[in-house]
């Protein structure tokens, strides 16, 4: 059985991070091996939450797993509470990332033009270093702009332009040029205005190809959708699917869950009821 290390936080509410990744990777027929970066009562979008930082415990996982002699077919990292955790992940990669290991980094920094509470310049610089090691990164547009030091407002002001996706593609190539491995960047949650209505799309860019897939935009955002997307992508690529196949699978899976959550008026911080759609990933 293939094995994926999941480096992310564990939140009691919000259906995100590890509570999203573990069921997705498991249902896709792989062993999910969680390495928690923090344990929270609820994800940080809630008005109140308690966070137990795991920075000083992360190395225990690395060292104990080394003693077991285990290997990983995939490594997926997400939320980091500070730059110190990024150094722990870099150490983990040194120990466990082999030539055949797929590493996916989700550079959790912000959304909708705003940075998250944990953001700092030190965290950003660390994330820039971390993403150079990844075969796949899955930023949203805000995170892509932060990583490329691009003004988000200037980019988003072009979303009615015909060349909007080309502008985003150009930013991706700026990052790819700095990567230490062959890299694919998948930009998530790109909202575009079309005559038939607003759509939300995901854009995959590599040196070899560009691929874009979209679905109707409900106008609402939900906790954990980026984590679910990254988890499906990671699982699909580790299983040997192509980038296009992985993108299609992740997009269609999320579309159903998001449309239902919108119909049911589920508060965004609680995430989507993805569990009933896990069979789509078999």
Task: Give the residues covered by each predicted segment.
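Charged C-terminal helix
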Residues: 244-282
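Phosphate-handling active-site elements
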Residues: 209-211, 236-250
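Conserved phosphate/ATP/ADP-binding segment of small-molecule kinases
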Residues: 117-210
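Short pre-catalytic strand/loop immediately N-terminal to key active-site residues, enriched for Gly-Thr
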Residues: 12, 210-224
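Conserved N-terminal subdomain of the carbohydrate kinase-like
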Residues: 1-105, 109-117, 275-280
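Short, small-residue alpha-helix embedded
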Residues: 145, 220-243
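Fold-independent oxyanion-binding glycine-rich loops
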Residues: 8-10, 37, 78-79, 106-108, ...
């Amino acid at each position: 059985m293939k094995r994926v290390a999941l480096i992310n936080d564990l939140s009691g509410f919000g259906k995100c991070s590890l509570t999203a990744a573990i069921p997705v990777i498991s249902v896709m027929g792989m062993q999910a091996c969680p390495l928690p970066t923090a344990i929270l009562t609820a994800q940080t979008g809630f008005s109140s939450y308690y966070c137990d930082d795991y920075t000083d415990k992360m190395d225990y996982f690395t060292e104990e797993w080394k003693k077991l002699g285990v290997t990983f077919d995939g490594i997926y990292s997400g939320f980091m509470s500070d730059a110190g955790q990024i150094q722990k992940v870099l150490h983990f990669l040194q120990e466990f990332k082999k030539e055949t290991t797929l590493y996916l980094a989700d550079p959790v920094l912000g959304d909708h033009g705003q940075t998250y509470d944990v953001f700092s310049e030190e965290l950003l610089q660390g994330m820039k270093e971390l993403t150079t090691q990844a075969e796949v990164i899955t930023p949203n547009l805000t995170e892509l702009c932060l990583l490329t030091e691009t003004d988000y407002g200037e980019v988003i002001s072009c979303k009615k332009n015909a060349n909007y996706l080309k502008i985003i593609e150009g930013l991706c190539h700026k990052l790819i040029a700095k990567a230490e491995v062959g890299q694919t960047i998948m930009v998530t949650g790109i909202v575009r205005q079309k005559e038939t209505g607003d759509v939300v799309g995901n854009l995959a860019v590599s040196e070899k190809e560009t691929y874009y897939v979209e679905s109707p935009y409900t106008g609402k955002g939900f906790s954990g959708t980026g984590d679910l997307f990254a988890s499906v992508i990671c699982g699909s690529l580790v299983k040997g699917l192509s980038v296009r196949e992985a993108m299609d699978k992740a997009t269609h899976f999320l579309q159903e869950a998001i449309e239902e959550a919108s119909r049911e008026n589920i508060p965004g911080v609680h995430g989507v009821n993805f569990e009933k759609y896990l069979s789509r990933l078999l």
